[in-house]
């Protein structure tokens, strides 16, 4: 699903750059990763009941990419988290729009859906609307910071793609 969405965004950037009659513009891309690991004791909710984290096996990241065709910039964030409330994404998009030339409507934020992460919803979990928790505010700031760093890392880029089968990478490991 993320690949289709990324491909759609990339194609949009390419098509918008092809329609210009002026001098050719260079596609630029920038990337950054922001550590979004919560503190020990944060509630992990992937097992459908909150369990406090007692150790960190792997750090959690929000991976950010910015594409710029000279006319339009888009930002994509993929975060290692179970899910993201709209309120957290909206806050991050507001911060991005405030600090960059990227409008909120050009920012895509998605979750990897890991079951080993904390929730930005606070103690009520993901199923009830709640005010943005401290961790949710932390996430929004980290997403915004990651996008700003990706903008600072913009450099000339080319787009390519390929296809390969790797059945050992996609399977249900637990059930």
Predicted features, each with a name:
Residues 23-175:
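Conserved beta-alpha junction segments in alpha/beta enzyme cores
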Residues 4-17:
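Bacterial N-terminal signal peptides
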